[in-house]
């Protein structure tokens, strides 16, 4: 929180400056306005004190023979090339330069498939002493392994969702991070779907979107899920309470609900909580007395839930933007808030040919979805891929229904195409139910998608994939264990 002694000093400095030099040529200050602005800037910085951005220049070392772990590429002393992150090896000009053009797919300037090591140093601030730290990588293709100061942390994977690496606590001061990104085919899903392929996306290597360290206090909250009920203005909430100490801790949790458009506060509530050691799953129901506005494609009304946990002067604020909307079906009709909706949509096959990867910028997705609306569309099907969170956020604001998917494996992908070699699918993947590798990946990726984007009202449809022609259709049990949106 803002240091009260620092604020007192700032007041004295500003007052002394104005009084000591009333007629000098020094800039004249409006004490109230400047102090207010200064306090606001400090407060905003204080809110961001739990985030440390790692965007900027990194070093990268290619590892085409996958010898980096054996030869300790995670330690210092290895020669690296400079690269700006977020970004890709293609943009930096690393890999094999393409000569001519590739038939039927995007022609990349440079090609590289395999592990690449990204390294840099960073400094942990003193006020992070004893705090739990998580590395957040917004978008990676496909696997990330992390080392801190030569110590292996863990491995994460996923094509359409962020990678979270739990680093534990780090002492204040300088540290070195090494991230091994492997864009090779980790699970055999082939290379013809848009989540992993060269048709409209490329098989890029790098890190996109946010790259940051996130700190949390000893008693913190995580994995917030909201379940709005349009029938009775009720909001069910679930989240994890994490106690990183070795003893039971008492604290306070407050809930505040605001209408984003008007910024009107419509609900506030707080209660004492007891956090046992480890992780506890917590549920809460907020009964909202006043009427709420529903969300749909014509009226994209949004609300912001703020949950703040406080314990012995340490606090953590988490926010979730969501909408009150209900999705049901009546025979052949889809109902949004009990109203039949005709889905007028577009097929999005990851069309970003200038970069070869999807934008993680909200404004860019708002621009795209406003074009949709100008043509009378209200729906987008992301063919065999899942977009970044920016797309869901923009769709929430504009009023677009999203269908996200995982992959595409069809019968012809398991066959060598001698007459059209370019159509031969890498790995010759068998269909789901006959492909243990893909059978493991799909339900895990579906669950990651729900975890990452399930609070967005625009996320109304979830699909395993496209044209699963050689699959065992009993695989629908994949969906039975997934929580409802």
Specify the residue positions occupied by each region the protein language model found.
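Substrate-binding/catalytic cleft of secreted carbohydrate-active enzymes
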Residues: 369-372, 379-485
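Secreted/periplasmic carbohydrate-active enzymes, especially glycoside hydrolases
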Residues: 1-11, 18-385, 389-394, 398-402, ...
